């Protein structure tokens, strides 16, 4: 099969790093190096070059899509003869644990909010819609946290449905990675943002991923543009272990940390436990529930070493 035939056989346009970077088209970099340092994750090297070459072209593309969506809404309002109702544009970001979804979400939030249109951009993670630990323990699901059955999907779907219905005030629960649990009485209130970035393992999942909990509507039904952050599993496991080691030296040393007992481990013991957690929980969840959703994404960013994006695939 020729390269042209291969290109026609896929629903994606593929760009290497330099091809994608060229699509920036003189969009100015509005983030300083100090601001970028604050946006990156605990185990990531996020450089000015990465933001300029990968995230600026992406923010330019998203700005085009969002503007097009607003024009479509205006056409519908003109047809119906109604006053404009503000309907947020939802960007979904999916991918494995440790791949850097949160950094991608934070960078896009910062860039999109600084476009000349000055749109309001909110960021919500689906972690807040995990069942509380009390419920997970009752259902013997603590070792399945992040798997489809560990989420309160009805609440998550209602949340995105309310957002897309133009509800003026919508609340979302928050999750603490320190206590490894939902934070009681600490809901985040969203008041009709222009853009909602929804980040989580499960934003691209659909009915086939929830046979235990049949319902007809899913988060992916409400997402306008979806991004899957991808990387080879060998890298993902390495990044997960390295992140675990950094947490052991930092967050785990906090007496309030759910994983405080891990702070006393030797490095060899910590690597062993992190490897086991990857094999039994995160790697398994990746293979069974996350990776199969990759080809549902509007755009796939594939990372190489040091979290540098080497390839971008954009749905035609």
Curated annotation (Swiss-Prot):
One Gene Ontology molecular-function label: pantothenate kinase activity
E.C. number: 2.7.1.33
GO BP: coenzyme A biosynthetic process
Disulfide linkage: none
Source domain of life: Bacteria
Chief subcellular location: cytoplasm
UniProt KW keywords: ATP-binding, Coenzyme A biosynthesis, Cytoplasm, Kinase, Nucleotide-binding, Transferase
Pathway stated in the Swiss-Prot or TrEMBL entry: Cofactor biosynthesis; coenzyme A biosynthesis; CoA from (R)-pantothenate: step 1/5
GO cellular component, one term: cytoplasm
Catalytically driven reaction(s): (R)-pantothenate + ATP = (R)-4'-phosphopantothenate + ADP + H(+)
InterPro entries: P-loop_NTPase (IPR027417), PanK (IPR004566), PRK/URK (IPR006083)
Positions annotated to bind ATP: 95-102
Location(s) in or outside the cell: Cytoplasm
Family: Belongs to the prokaryotic pantothenate kinase family.
Protein name per its UniProtKB record: Pantothenate kinase
Gene behind this protein: coaA
């Amino acid at each position: 099969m020729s390269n042209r035939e291969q290109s026609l056989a896929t629903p994606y346009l593929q760009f290497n790093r330099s091809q994608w970077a060229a699509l920036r088209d003189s969009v100015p970099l509005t983030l300083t190096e100090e601001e970028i340092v604050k946006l990156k994750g605990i185990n990531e090297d996020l450089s000015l070059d990465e933001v300029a070459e990968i995230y600026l072209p992406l923010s330019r593309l998203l700005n085009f899509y969002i503007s097009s969506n607003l024009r479509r809404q205006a056409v519908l309002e003109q047809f119906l003869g109604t006053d404009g109702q503000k309907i947020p544009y939802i960007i979904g970001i999916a991918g494995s644990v440790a791949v850097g979804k949160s950094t991608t979400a934070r960078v896009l939030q910062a860039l999109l909010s600084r476009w000349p249109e000055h749109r309001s951009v909110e960021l919500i993670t689906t972690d807040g819609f995990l069942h509380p630990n009390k419920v997970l323990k009752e259902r013997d699901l603590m070792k399945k946290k992040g798997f489809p059955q560990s989420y309160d999907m009805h609440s998550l779907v209602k949340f995105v449905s309310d957002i897309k219905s133009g509800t003026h005030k919508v609340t979302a629960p928050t999750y603490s990675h320190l206590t490894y649990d939902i934070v009681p009485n600490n809901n985040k209130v969203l008041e009709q943002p222009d853009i909602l970035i929804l980040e989580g393992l499960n934003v691209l999942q659909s009915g086939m991923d929830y046979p235990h909990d049949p319902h007809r509507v899913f988060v992916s039904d409400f997402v306008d543009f979806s991004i899957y952050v991808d990387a080879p599993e060998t890298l993902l496991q390495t990044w997960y272990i390295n992140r675990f080691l950094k947490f052991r030296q930092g967050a785990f040393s906090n007496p309030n940390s759910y994983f405080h007992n891990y702070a006393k481990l030797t490095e060899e013991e910590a690597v062993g436990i992190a490897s086991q957690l990857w094999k039994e929980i995160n790697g398994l969840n990746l293979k069974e529930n996350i990776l199969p959703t990759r080809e549902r994404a509007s755009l796939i960013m594939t990372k190489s070493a040091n979290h540098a994006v080497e390839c971008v695939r954009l749905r035609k």
